[in-house]
Regions:
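Secondary-structure edge/capping motif, primarily at the C-terminal ends of alpha-helices
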Residues: 27-31, 58-61, 86, 113-117, ...
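Preference for long, well-ordered alpha-helical segments
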Residues: 94-150
Length: 150
């Protein structure tokens, strides 16, 4: 196991969770719909919990915890588009944008899991558990989106 590579992989997931928290904070503020506000708050909480776990793992490896978001790249552009979308208050469009963001988060988890040889068993299990929770969130968003589009 390459410790520096482990730290980098864990920090990649911290950043995607930071992005997710910021995106859903924006969504929660901008949407007028109570059920979506609750959903977005819960998704923020999931990513905040993930971030804390990941940061602890980085610290145990004597690494420096990444605090930022990806100010460049696809995920940031998604959230900027998302903010513009939600100001129109179209439930289906909001949820469609959320699903896209969840896809990007899951892609990042898959990318890290593709390099599992650089992770301890403990960190691998944590990442798999976090990914499973994001998959649950994705399913919720997709279901609500499909209902809104009908």
């Amino acid at each position: 196991m390459d410790t520096q590579k482990s730290i980098t992989l864990l920090n990649d997931l911290i950043v995607i969770n930071n992005d997710r928290v910021e995106g859903y904070k924006t969504a929660e503020i901008e949407t007028p719909e109570t059920d979506l506000k609750i959903l977005f708050y819960d998704m923020q909480a999931t990513s905040e919990s993930n971030r804390i776990e990941l940061a602890s793992a980085v610290t145990k490896l004597n690494g420096e915890v990444e605090e930022g978001t990806r100010a460049t790249g696809k995920f940031f552009r998604f959230w900027m588009d998302f903010k513009a979308t939600i100001t129109g208050n179209n439930r289906g469009t909001i949820l469609d944008s959320c699903e896209y963001g969840e896809d990007k988060a899951l892609d990042e988890y898959e990318n890290v899991l593709d390099e599992k040889e650089h992770l301890s068993i403990e960190n691998l299990q944590m990442i798999q558990r976090q990914k499973a929770q994001i998959e649950v969130d994705h399913t919720k968003v997709k279901k609500l989106r499909d209902e809104a589009m009908d």
